[in-house]
Amino acid sequence: MSSIDPKQFGKVAVLLGGNSAEREVSLNSGRLVLQGLRDAGIDAHPFDPAERPLAALKEEGFVRAFNALHGGYGENGQIQGALDFYGIRYTGSGVLGSALGLDKFRTKLVWQQLGIPTPPFEAVLRGDDYEARAKEIVAKLGLPLFVKPASEGSSVAVIKVKSADALPAALIEAVKFDRIVVVEKSIEGGGEYTACIAGNLDLPVIRIVPAGEFYDYHAKYIANDTQYLIPCGLTADEEARLKVLARRAFDVLGCTDWGRADFMLDADGNPYFLEVNTAPGMTDHSLPPKAARAVGISYQELVVAVLALTLKD
């Protein structure tokens, strides 16, 4: 990778922590990002919006931000809007792409409209008759199902439901986290994959093989028995085709520069996109560093390359 003069970045804030359900993940990501940037000679400093007002960024002379916040206001367009207001360049998507990318329900509506394959689903609202909706959904989608709060990341409160009797309780649990819940048909037979996006870097698709039922919060950030397969087992042509489709799934939401698109394959190899992530985890368990490392890009090189995307017009 080409060398970049660290001085051109100016004073950089690494946004970490925040007050979402993913605070601990964000703190872990942010600390590693901070170290990577500092090791590259960049004038980087930690900044936790849960502890300090955002106005301090401008007051203290920050000109750029690496967004390592996950979920909540760090990923739903609010932080992005504030940074735009203060004239501070930042990593990742802007207001629209961030807001839409975090909202699984509206993401799937856009994908349906534009022909991006996504699993069949139903939406349940807080306050609905959960017993009645559960019966309707099982009749329409069958089993098994995934129940997901529309706007939580890191698989927070995602529940796999295998029996009709278990669905009402899963809905009651999920609406504690969001007023809209997505109930999605489980795609079986071909495995789970992710395509990492970082500007023009050509990163490999990763196949994810969790030891448990699915790739949940524990598998993502705690367990050491999740398998990450690179190469992912697809042919070169299949992988190239899925990278193009993943980029399109990302782009049509207004997402830019940096993120991830997650998808399943069915038994016939057909892809179904689940969600995008516009502020991916950057812990030692996270997927973008693994994809980068597989093609000879170090953690430090990756975070500098992502930050460098803020230099373009």
Curated annotation (Swiss-Prot):
Per the record, the pathway is:
Cell wall biogenesis; peptidoglycan biosynthesis
Q: What are the EC numbers?
A: 6.3.2.4
Its GO CC terms are: cytosol
Q: Where does Mg(2+) 2 bind?
A: 275, 277
**Keyword Ribonucleoprotein recorded:** no
GO biological process, any: cell wall organization
The record ties this protein, via PROSITE patterns, to:
ATP_GRASP, DALA_DALA_LIGASE_1, DALA_DALA_LIGASE_2
Identify the domain of life.
Bacteria
Q: Which cofactor does it need?
A: Mg(2+); Mn(2+)
Cofactor stoichiometry and binding remark: Binds 2 magnesium or manganese ions per subunit.
Localization of this protein: Cytoplasm
One Pfam family of this chain: Dala_Dala_lig_C
Write down the chemical reaction(s) this protein catalyses: 2 D-alanine + ATP = D-alanyl-D-alanine + ADP + phosphate + H(+)
What are the binding positions for Mg(2+) 1 in this chain?
Answer: 262, 275
Q: Which cysteines are cross-linked by disulfides? A: none
Q: Which InterPro entries match?
A: ATP-grasp, ATP_grasp_subdomain_1, D-Ala_lig_Van_CS, D_ala_D_ala, Dala_Dala_lig_C, Dala_Dala_lig_N, PreATP-grasp_dom_sf
Q: Where does ATP bind?
A: 138-193
Q: Name one GO molecular function term.
A: D-alanine-D-alanine ligase activity
User: Which ranges carry the ATP-grasp domain?
Assistant: 108-308
Q: Which UniProt keywords apply?
A: ATP-binding, Cell shape, Cell wall biogenesis/degradation, Cytoplasm, Ligase, Magnesium, Manganese, Metal-binding, Nucleotide-binding, Peptidoglycan synthesis
Give the similarity note: Belongs to the D-alanine--D-alanine ligase family.
**What is the documented function of this protein?**
Cell wall formation.
Task: Provide the protein name.
Answer: D-alanine--D-alanine ligase
Q: Give the organism the record lists.
A: Paraburkholderia xenovorans (strain LB400)
What is the gene called? ddl
